[in-house]
Amino acid sequence: MVQYFTEKGPTYNEVIEIIKKKYGKNARVMTYKTVPHGGILGLFSKDWVEVSGYVRYDIGNQQINVEDEKRKILQSIKREENSSIEDVLKEVKSLKTELAHKKENINHPTITKIEDILRENDFSENYIKDINEFIKREFSLSDLDDYERVREDVVLYIAKTIKCSGSIIDNLKKRVFILVGPTGVGKTTTIAKLAAIYGINGESKSLNIKIITIDNYRIGAKKQIQTYGDIMGIPVRAIESFKDLKDEITDSKDFDLILVDTIGKSPKDFMKLAEMKELLNACGRDAEFHLAVSSTTKTSDVKEIFHQFSPFNYKTVIFTKVDETTCVGNLISLIYEMKKVVSYVTDGQIVPHNISVAEPLTFIRRINGYRISDDAEFIKKIKSKSYY
């Protein structure tokens, strides 16, 4: 626990002596300055020295103090054997409150180490605070000495906060998959990857897939997706109007899955987003929106993207370019704090590779400082452990 202090005196050396007597040898000076002292209405004052600093108390002492408090209250209860049940219950309640307060203020080395790792991985301060509260809620002071046990449970807790939807074909109720998102996040390549893994590399059977693009503005966009389609033997249609899109969807009843590639839009271009939403309404009730976001995007910008694309009522988020970022803590924090669900992650440009169905382990493996020795055992623990 850290205690901060400010002391004053005629000279610097005298103040230091005061600090040593009051706070002991562990006291540390942060700043000092000259301040006026005495006088009348600001006149005839003398210059004194004001010193500010802190003292860190050893965790062991904190634990001893907690045990002392237990003994004191228990002795008090014993002395008052004739007290009523209500009085005893009050004493016990007071003990719980006091011990909880002391535990809350203890900065155990295990907690400090875990907080440092989370910050290094770019987790948000709110998320770190939540982890801190989880640790203090789930572990006793003696349990905190077992760093490996606490670390393992923290990793499991983090995994529980990552909500994933599974494959889009696990429960194929909506057969029109529309991918929206800002410019340059890799929507076209992602559409091609999905077409490849479900159209020509299906595990049980390949689906009958069609690709539709409404991106007729970006130079080479139509040619790019058409090339992918030709290589895979999957039909590609370029659409420009609401009527054409509606007719194309109607004429595609024999297809199991229709993948729609859209125009990249700035989340700040509200008018363009509204126009695109109106056009895509032609896909009807069979349509399902998904949002593509680059993992390299700043946290504040990702929040903006989540918010500005909300009119599309997107079901899941696809994080692209995961291979281009060194930290995923900000992504985990965002999907937890903003209650988002992740369906896929991409980590390269190669079609049909470099895409996978998102699962908690996908993100956990990328947390620097945490290692998973047995994936199967870890997944089993995720399913069995419950913190909610």
UniProtKB/Swiss-Prot annotation:
Taxonomic lineage of this organism? Bacteria, Pseudomonadati, Spirochaetota, Spirochaetia, Spirochaetales
Annotated NCBIfam families: FlhF, PRK12723.1
Q: A Gene Ontology MF term for this entry?
A: GTPase activity
Q: What's an example GO cellular component term for this entry?
A: cytosol
Q: What is this protein called?
A: Flagellar biosynthesis protein FlhF
InterPro entries associated with the record: AAA+_ATPase, FlhF, FlhF__GTPase_dom, P-loop_NTPase, SRP54_GTPase_dom
Enumerate the subcellular locations listed in this protein's record, separating them with semicolons.
Answer: Cell membrane
Name the predominant localization.
membrane
Membrane topology note: Peripheral membrane protein
Q: Which PANTHER family match?
A: FLAGELLAR BIOSYNTHESIS PROTEIN FLHF (PTHR43134:SF3), SIGNAL RECOGNITION PARTICLE RECEPTOR SUBUNIT ALPHA (PTHR43134)
